[in-house]
Amino acid sequence: MSEPKAIDPKLSTTDRVVKAVPFPPSHRLTAKEVFDNDGKPRVDILKAHLMKEGRLEETVALRIITEGASILRQEKNLLDIDAPVTVCGDIHGQFFDLMKLFEVGGSPANTRYLFLGDYVDRGYFSIECVLYLWALKILYPKTLFLLRGNHECRHLTEYFTFKQECKIKYSERVYDACMDAFDCLPLAALMNQQFLCVHGGLSPEINTLDDIRKLDRFKEPPAYGPMCDILWSDPLEDFGNEKTQEHFTHNTVRGCSYFYSYPAVCEFLQHNNLLSILRAHEAQDAGYRMYRKSQTTGFPSLITIFSAPNYLDVYNNKAAVLKYENNVMNIRQFNCSPHPYWLPNFMDVFTWSLPFVGEKVTEMLVNVLNICSDDELGSEEDGFDGATAAARKEVIRNKIRAIGKMARVFSVLREESESVLTLKGLTPTGMLPSGVLSGGKQTLQSATVEAIEADEAIKGFSPQHKITSFEEAKGLDRINERMPPRRDAMPSDANLNSINKALASETNGTDSNGSNSSNIQ
């Protein structure tokens, strides 16, 4: 009878534990690989490489971004786009879902596309989205169109994830090039002379299409004014059934810009001889929402499109694109696609593992400090007077309590690691609220972001609970919909309308040679 083979006690530190998951390519694509002899990007090669989490040489990434920006710079504030066209909403760094979008909407080689902005932030593949979309813009400058969203700016990309992503995957040079390119993005599009397409919505300072054409867009979006409103405004929650007579009210959800009403939209459409407004900017459970119909045309006065399925991996929403052809509008929905996993805020595995190590270290410290009993401490301190001995005992007990508290924090971090990561992902800064971990599981269950950035609370969050509904995820993520604090924000006691009316300097008369909208066909 043969003896059983001994088990090798050595554990390899170089072999991949999960061999079924391929390692990302270490080779960075060169200019010769990305561009053909005519200087056009090979988008199929680029797509295949990015799908494997591959990267480009920095000079190649910069070339794509700057060449795309030079094309965008030549375009007008208000694009004129003919049908047929496929309109897409927010992408938010969900590159693998963007690939699904092109499967559903059609190949960019033979399909006209209009994107309504928000290509970056929140998702962990934002730079891949920018590089691929900008490469498509270089290849198809007359059939693929990109508008600016509220996240295409320095203020939000520094606050959320895009700047950090660029620095980790490439460099700050690439990030700066992206910011310059974002300044070139058009603000709106007139589709088929019937539909105004923007990211956010209307402004009390924009009454005609020429008001959009006259804006100076080549800058960081201001904290208020017509350019801000185009990117940030939303329809009222009770749009079409308003309880107020005001056309525009302060947007309390965003902390800037306005809510606009059904009468405001109908008045704008009638004044400019338009059929509807197409916009993005708000997550939708079904991927789209059609609002109350216009009384004069019988067509929805406003349509929201959102193209990031299972937004943030917790919303459980569908995504949609809008296809308009031969005066027929079709909505095509799609679900999320699998994607590689990143820890929150691009955390590395060593940082992530610290709670596990920390728990063991603090456990050892507590055990060391607990070796001495009260009797032993008392016998050692016979030489001290009563007050000194008592004080020394109290110091040691306080140290034990402090180490014990630290041990409890690390224990919560380890045991509830998944919930902690989810909560981090839903807070604006990626940091946990003060005091959450030291309070243990019960405190984590009622954690709020109050101590971090805002008065809005993340309510109902429990370590044992999984987010299952769209409304729950939207409520938890509400704080992230606000404009982050900025120095040039409008004074809280100022009148919004009077300040916006004073912004005559925002218009410079350029880009005013655009055609007026024609009658609805």
From Swiss-Prot:
Residues 475-521 are annotated as: Disordered. Zn(2+) binds at D118, N150, H199, H281. Residues 341-369 are annotated as: Calcineurin B binding. Fe cation binds at D90, H92, D118. The keyword Cell membrane applies. The modification Phosphoserine is found at S469, S492. The keyword Phosphoprotein applies. Residues 392-406 are annotated as: Calmodulin-binding. A motif (SAPNY motif) lies at residues 307-311. Forms a complex composed of a calmodulin-dependent catalytic subunit (also known as calcineurin A) and a regulatory Ca(2+)-binding subunit (also known as calcineurin B). There are three catalytic subunits, each encoded by a separate gene (PPP3CA, PPP3CB, and PPP3CC) and two regulatory subunits which are also encoded by separate genes (PPP3R1 and PPP3R2). In response to an increase in Ca(2+) intracellular levels, forms a complex composed of PPP3CA/calcineurin A, calcineurin B and calmodulin. Interacts (via calcineurin B binding domain) with regulatory subunit PPP3R1/calcineurin B. Its cofactor is Fe(3+); Zn(2+). The record marks W352 as: Interaction with PxVP motif in substrate. It is found in: Cytoplasm; Cell membrane; Cell membrane, Sarcolemma; Cytoplasm, Myofibril, Sarcomere, Z line. Residues 407-414 are annotated as: Autoinhibitory segment. The modification 3'-nitrotyrosine is found at Y224. Coiled coil: none annotated. PANTHER family: SERINE/THREONINE-PROTEIN PHOSPHATASE 2B CATALYTIC SUBUNIT 1-RELATED. It comes from Bos taurus (Bovine). This is Protein phosphatase 3 catalytic subunit alpha. It is a peripheral membrane protein. Expressed in brain and thymus (at protein level). Isoform 1: Expressed in brain. Isoform 2: Expressed in cardiac muscle. Residues 507-521 have a biased composition (Low complexity). Residues 327-336 are annotated as: Interaction with PxIxIF motif in substrate. InterPro entries: Calcineurin-like_PHP_ApaH, Metallo-depent_PP-like, MPP_PP2B, PP2B, Ser/Thr-sp_prot-phosphatase. Belongs to the PPP phosphatase family. PP-2B subfamily.
